[in-house]
UniProtKB/Swiss-Prot annotation:
The gene is rnz. It holds the Pfam family Lactamase_B_2. Transmembrane segments: none annotated. The keyword Hydrolase applies. This is Ribonuclease Z. Belongs to the RNase Z family.
Length: 304
């Protein structure tokens, strides 16, 4: 089975702490890396995880609060120093171009590669990127400024060849790749053997949803229904719910309720407020509602 894993580079919130880095994750899917959010310190975390800079082609920014995007200027500059030549694509909500363009002009105008900026309508659920491995959809979130989550949906994987059937019909080996991709087979005498008689369905595609930052927002549930893994911010505990409401963030219990309603297979919480020195309370609060909950931590890798 092809790799589909999530690397946690940072899971803290706005205020810097000695125990968590600002938000950033990297998805490793087949032959590519996809970054979600790019807080300060991301370059060191990227190296700690032994991730290859050259495999990263797309960066997705959730919103323009500093703890989610202040790592971008340094990261973009470093890629140039490393001799990158392939285009880097940066996706984000309205304002992403105003944020990046002056930086690119001032510090990165002689780089050996191009940066393409793609503005996303944070109010719409839409397909924002597609390649041979994945489709990426926007998830409208509810925060103090335009914020967007991301749903990564693996492309349908190839069907499994029924070797006994292939041998029965004397199908040449050269035809196997086409059959695995879904083609019927025509025998030398002109008979058409339907693909369903020659293959079985491939493994269901895996799905990962990233939802941060946002207040409790049940409207996202239909979009993320049945995901294999849901990352949902859990900035506060229920005892600080008033502060969560004031700042348009979620509690751990609310994150778990979203996971429960969506029928997610697993929940990953993060974006912890700096007031909590230990995240065990946040984890237990979430698990009281949705048992298969994991507390994110730096340098953690979760396989889907």
């Amino acid at each position: 089975m092809a790799a589909f894993s999530v690397h946690i580079l940072g899971c803290g919130s706005a205020l810097p702490t000695t125990h968590h880095h600002p938000s950033s994750q990297v998805i490793d899917l087949r032959d590519k890396l996809y970054m979600i959010d790019c807080g300060e310190g991301v370059q060191r975390q990227f190296r700690h995880e032994k991730l290859h800079f050259g495999r990263l082609i797309h960066i997705f920014i959730s919103h323009l609060h500093g703890d989610h995007c202040f790592g971008l200027p340094g990261f973009i500059s470093t890629l140039g120093l490393l001799g990158r030549t392939g285009t880097l694509h940066v996706h984000g909500p309205e304002g992403i171009e105003r944020f990046l363009s002056p930086i690119l002009e001032q510090f990165c105008h002689r780089m050996p590669y191009q940066v393409e900026i793609h503005t996303i309508d944070a109010s719409r659920h839409a397909l924002v990127h597609e390649d041979k491995s994945v489709k990426v959809y926007s998830i409208p979130l509810s925060h103090r400024i335009p914020a967007v989550g991301y749903l990564f949906e693996e492309k349908c994987r190839a069907r499994h060849l029924n070797k006994a059937a292939a041998e029965f019909y004397n199908i040449p080996l050269a035809e196997y790749p086409l059959i695995i991709e879904g083609s019927d087979y025509t025998t030398p005498d002109g008979r058409i053997i339907p693909n369903r008689h020659l293959t079985t369905p491939g493994t269901p595609p895996r799905r990962y949803a990233y939802c941060s930052d946002t207040e409790f927002c049940p409207s996202i549930v239909p979009i993320i229904q049945g995901v294999d893994l849901l990352y949902h911010e859990a900035t506060f505990m229920e005892e600080d719910r008033a502060r969560a409401k004031e700042t348009f963030h979620s509690t751990a219990k609310e994150a778990a309720e979203i996971a429960r309603q969506a029928g997610a297979k697993r929940l990953l919480i993060g974006h912890y407020s700096g007031r909590y020195k230990d995240v065990q309370g946040l984890l237990e609060e979430a698990q009281s509602v949705f048992k298969p909950t994991i507390a994110a931590n730096e340098r953690m890798r979760i396989d889907l």
